[in-house]
Amino acid sequence: RRNPAGVWELTTGGDPLTRGAESGALLRGLMYYQERAFVDQIRRIVPSERYLRFLRSFIVIFNRNLGHCVPEEYRREIFASSRWCSHEFDAIGNAYERQINYHAAHDIGHVMQEYMLVGCSSFATWGGRSADSTLLVGRNFDFYVGDDFARNKLVTFCRPERGIPFASVGWAGMSGVLSGMNAAGLTVTLNAAKGALPTRAATPISLLARTILQYASTIEEACAIADTTRTFVSESLLIASARDRRAVVIEKTPERSALYEGEGEQLRCTNHYQSAAFADDPYNRENIATSDSPYRLQRLGELLDSLAPLTPARAVTILRDRRGLGGRDIGLTNEKSLNQAIAHHSVVFAPERGLMWLSTEPWQAGRFVCYDLGRIFAGEAPPEGRLDLPEEELPADSLFLREDYPRIVAYRRDCAALRQA
């Protein structure tokens, strides 16, 4: 169902086949919409039909063993949901193959970073850096596949047959996790990093995040899962735990992992590695020297200092920030800003309170709706009526919507027209 703020909500549970069949049947129309938006955007990025055919062939060959890298539980879930997919895109592959490959979309985005498909900024505070001393986590998920793709956000509340109940933010057809929190108060968010191009199929990072969210309740358990999973690409996973009352970043490449704990009672994460273990890594050094990631990390530090101690409302202020270092005006949609007006979603977690605030469109400018996981997972079935808490929602950025939003829409419309001219 769709709540009054425009966020789609799915409650599911049980064994993998049941979960997949339920989501496929309920989200059939949305799954088609997301696949159409994704394919259309890829065609805009790669307009050559000849190169698209080559790309399809390459992905088929490269990912031929991808299914073996996905835990059976999730293969069964994805298979069951894929039975409800459209046949319109069968030229790309059958429904199951397509859905498995789409779970590597975030990973593929690493390879296409020059198209600004993948960004992300996240942070966590606790103790004296939080207004009530409890953990607070904020993140922008800047995975840009066009505004149409981000239009229908989906929050899934899953009570699996095995593991811990959890909430995850994504889109229809996505069994993996991009941003989520479980009933034990553990959160997982993903931030792309730079590494060597993948040479063979491995576990998509979103499915590693799903495994952590479903089966870990502490940082130690999350690290153990990450250490034993070979992944496609390099990634930072910000893990916050209510039981540990702190947050860490797991810095992972296909070959190794490292733990970054930061300093003091806060943690920042953008798109490069910060631990000593990767200080001399050539890909990380190049990333620091040539990308906007260090700039955004510095801006995060400025805002965390100036807005401390943090509240959920102040966390949203950080996620919406469009300025550069020192508060300088660097223009709208600048890659150096935390808010580039490309976010698929923006979310704030309060793990010790079991609360999460999710953005509504456009990007992170709409109001943030609030969910109480303790309330949603309290009984055998979800509560009747609305799942969100209207009294806890945070207001929209009305000034931005009135003044800057129309300018961005017009700018992107004009750019699209120029590209087609």
Can you describe what each PLM-predicted range is?
Residues 101-208, 224, 344-348, 356-359:
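Internal mixed beta-strand/loop scaffold within catalytic domains of large alpha/beta enzymes
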Residues 1-119, 213-257, 262-421:
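C-terminus-biased signal that marks the final domain/tail of proteins
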